[in-house]
């Protein structure tokens, strides 16, 4: 108690020295008031009272009766203090009991301190001061690192861990550490699957109250946080802060492993798992593992087939709202993300980020089999299937398999004959938006992909990639039949026809066939009777 008082004096909270402290300084035995167990529940309320006086029991009961032991000078067998609180500002104590108790105690024994807003019994003098601070809002404890102030020393100690990086609270299940016990408790729900906070509107459950609060805004449709730069609105201030970095280009979160920077701390955390190779989130249905819980949630929809988000324009449905938002830009033609280097615009910020690597020449993801590097992890995953021969996406119509889901989607249009993407310049239609984009370059003559080594330019990035192999001598596509290698997969496919005997072109008017692509045009003219 004496030490607490000295600390309070040091930070400038206590102005005068109580008689009790004088008694302690002189080495005299202080009086002792025992705290008895809580009895039945008459009305008592002040949440602060419960926390300060009986911390453990106070959490369980808001309404309590306080029984203090009999004092020698007091005539009654037990002295009761009944407390009635209607609100924080109105906390009344029976005046006779208050005065009676003070008369029964000596000056040094006085345990009742009068608060500015209400009267309260404290088991420590320091608690009286701490309680007063809560009402005044005084913040006497300042962080030397960032100047942030706190009203409690314990709060400052907790805050300091942000700067020191100390994380004393560790999860026994996975070893992840936290700087607060509350964060560890929340984290444990990932392992237990406990989601105590449920939305009354749609039944969706969450493991954090803050997540439920944020979720509820979806049902109201409110977006109070608006970007001054582009007018886009958000339902969370944090989302607006993150969005603003698109305009500023700020990326404060940097990976120590590869130097890559991110605009969000969560994206950096997810990225780090790539280096660690860790995939803690496993699908119970098929056993597939993921590095992020959100990716697992998205994956599960494959098994359920649920698609909640429908496009009003064309009726196409999506499993994620973000996918629908991106899809709508096909109809609107909106491309809000523009490259400052070459002026090219994109529908998605992630596509712009990937595009920028073309200019920077960045390729973080390397194939362990052939050492080929890629600017996107997804491209590396797809590339690996060349070596494994894996083709997980199969057409139900004809049985043809593909190593990309997008290839299967494109292939299916062959059966339907649908060509939704039309060129405004010449009227030619295509079954893919990417094919239309490539086609448009014919009219503009634009060649944005230039090789610095020889200065040659191309209208497609894939053509530039193939061209680079001429200089490097790289030939990653090898024929399993004869061992011959090529720098282009399409050339390998044509080469394979030599072994199978398949012909590339056979005119309807004659029985001759051609297996050389260079001779096809000549054959066509001969069959047509041209000279």
Curated annotation (Swiss-Prot):
Gene Ontology MF, one: RNA polymerase II cis-regulatory region sequence-specific DNA binding
SMART domains: KRAB, ZnF_C2H2
Entry keyword annotation includes Transcription regulation: yes
Coiled coil: none
InterPro entries: KRAB (IPR001909), KRAB_dom_sf (IPR036051), Znf_C2H2-type (IPR050758), Znf_C2H2_sf (IPR036236), Znf_C2H2_type (IPR013087)
Major subcellular location class: nucleus
GO BP annotations listed: regulation of DNA-templated transcription
SUPFAM superfamilies: beta-beta-alpha zinc fingers, KRAB domain (Kruppel-associated box)
GO CC aspect terms: nucleus
Family classification: Belongs to the krueppel C2H2-type zinc-finger protein family.
Record function comment: May be involved in transcriptional regulation.
Protein name, per record: Zinc finger protein 492
């Amino acid at each position: 108690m004496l030490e607490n008082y000295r600390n309070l004096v040091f930070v400038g909270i206590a102005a005068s020295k109580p008689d009790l402290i004088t008694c302690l300084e002189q080495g005299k035995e202080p009086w002792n008031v025992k705290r008895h167990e809580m009895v039945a529940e008459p009305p008592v309320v002040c949440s602060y009272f419960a926390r300060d006086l009986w911390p453990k029991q106070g959490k369980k009961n808001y309404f309590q009766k306080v029984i203090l032991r009999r004092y020698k000078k007091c005539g009654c067998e037990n002295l009761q203090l009944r407390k009635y609180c209607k609100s924080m500002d109105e906390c009344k104590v029976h005046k006779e009991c208050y005065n009676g108790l003070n008369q029964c105690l000596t000056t040094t024994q006085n345990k009742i301190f009068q608060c500015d807003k209400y009267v309260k019994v404290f088991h420590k003098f320091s608690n009286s001061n701490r309680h007063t601070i809560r009402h005044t809002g005084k913040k006497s404890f300042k962080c030397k690192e960032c100047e942030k102030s706190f009203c409690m020393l314990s709060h400052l100690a907790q805050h300091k861990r942000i700067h020191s990086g100390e994380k004393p609270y560790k999860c026994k299940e996975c070893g992840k550490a936290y700087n607060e016990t509350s964060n560890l408790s929340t984290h444990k729900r990932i392992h237990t699957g406990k989601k105590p906070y449920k939305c009354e509107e749609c039944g969706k459950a969450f493991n954090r109250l803050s997540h439920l609060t944020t979720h509820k805004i979806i049902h109201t449709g409110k977006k109070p946080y608006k970007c001054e730069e582009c007018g886009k609105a958000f339902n969370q201030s944090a989302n607006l802060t993150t969005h603003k970095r698109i305009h500023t280009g700020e990326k404060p979160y940097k990976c120590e492993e590869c130097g890559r920077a991110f605009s969000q701390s969560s994206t950096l955390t997810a990225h780090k798992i790539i280096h660690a190779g860790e995939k803690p989130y496993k699908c119970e249905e098929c056993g597939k593992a993921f590095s992020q819980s959100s990716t697992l949630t998205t994956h599960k929809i494959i098994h359920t087939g649920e698609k909640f988000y429908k496009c009003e324009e064309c009726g196409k449905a999506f499993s994620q709202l973000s996918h629908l938002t991106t899809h709508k830009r096909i109809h609107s033609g909106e491309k809000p993300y523009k490259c400052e280097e070459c002026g090219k615009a994109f529908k998605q910020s992630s596509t712009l980020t990937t595009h920028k690597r073309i200019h920077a020449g960045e390729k973080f993801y390397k194939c362990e089999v052939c050492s080929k590097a890629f600017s996107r992890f997804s491209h590396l995953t797809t590339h690996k299937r060349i070596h494994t021969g894996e083709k997980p996406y199969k057409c139900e119509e004809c049985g043809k398999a593909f190593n990309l889901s997008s290839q299967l989607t494109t292939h299916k249009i062959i059966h339907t004959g649908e060509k939704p993407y039309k060129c405004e310049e010449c009227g030619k239609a295509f079954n893919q938006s990417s094919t239309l984009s490539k086609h448009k370059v014919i009219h503009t003559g634009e060649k944005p992909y230039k090789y610095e080594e020889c200065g040659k330019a191309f209208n497609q990035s894939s053509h530039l990639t193939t061209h680079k192999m001429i200089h490097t001598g790289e030939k990653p596509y090898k024929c399993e039949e004869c061992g011959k290698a090529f720098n282009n997969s399409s050339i390998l496919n044509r080469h394979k026809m030599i072994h199978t005997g398949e012909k590339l072109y056979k005119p309807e008017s004659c029985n001759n066939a051609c297996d050389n692509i260079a001779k096809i045009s000549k054959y066509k003219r001969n069959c047509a009777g041209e000279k």
